[in-house]
Amino acid sequence: MGKKQIMIPPIIVGIATLSGFVIMHFFPAPSPIEVCLRSHNDTFNVHSRIDLEIDGQKKLMSDNVGKSKDGRECLRVIHTDKIGDQVHVQFVRPVRLTLDDFMKIYSADNSTIQVVDNSTGSNLYQNITLADYNVDYSYFSEDRFVKISNLTSSPPLSDTFLAKITLVSK
């Protein structure tokens, strides 16, 4: 074999690798929170708790959080499986998602959230306009709730994660 024949395979591999890096740089994969899941049985599953409190009253998340995107049916990476305080993080691989990512799904329009009031024994769905409230976020750590000043710096959602979203009327 000549030198040219020996050099051809490494050159082809080098060009293919460089092409892959260029494609990934200019066309990155979408953020996990933008993805619609194909099924409800992916390998990475985390269940976190998020307590909602509005003017001192405990509220629950509805069972349709993370079930649609842009008005069409879509199972999002962060969603609720039933009415309550538990969110389900599900993906094909381990992923680090925070309370900020949850709020991008829970309040897609960044102005309203839907809550459930079951204080009377029956579920009453309410749409809450966030602009009417002072909103505080915190997470439970070392026997107390720690205020989150910047949602992007919150700890990742995990099976032991407990957050509190407190809304107080302005």
Predicted regions and their residues:
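Ubiquitin-like/PB1-type beta-grasp interaction modules and other compact soluble beta-rich domains
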Residues: 2-170
